[in-house]
Amino acid sequence: MTTNQLQANGDRFWDTIEASAQIGPGVAGGLRRLALTDSDAEVRALFRQWCEEAGCTVTIDQMGSMFARRDGREDLPPVLVGSHLDTQIAGGRYDGIVGVLAGLEIVRTLNDLGITTKRPIEVVNWTNEEGARFQPPMVAAGVFAGVYELDWALARPTPVSYTHLTLPTIVR
């Protein structure tokens, strides 16, 4: 195979982005999909469906981050690619979703071409990456990277507008 043959399906990638951008419409063509709200749950379910259709095994960690794993030839640490599906209160249409869905398109392209990688690939959707609901931003990725302790992260105060919810009860 030449490098010219290793090409993503741009139409499929665009259609996937546009389908996800229909969930949580905001103002001026943007999105409003705050972490762990109904619209976030809806796009997460769609992402999970797409990943499973691509042959990935989807797991969710204690912070609610999603990991869609495509196995490799060897049992090695995975290559992670992704971003987030949540948005700011008035978020951009492509912020975050492009990183997550580009990872999914990589997996789909490898599948289309019958390529098995040496290492597993995991497409990640980090929970609360934007930090619009729970401070600080990137708290779930921070727990994963060892920057924050899990108990500390789960004890983050809930914003006033969501006083009936807490991060631990939402993640469960």
Which residues are covered by each model-predicted region?
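Acidic/His- and Gly-rich active-site-bordering loop/insert found
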Residues: Q7-G91
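Predominant activation on well-ordered alpha-helical scaffold segments within soluble catalytic domains
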Residues: I17-E18, R44, R48, V100-R108, ...
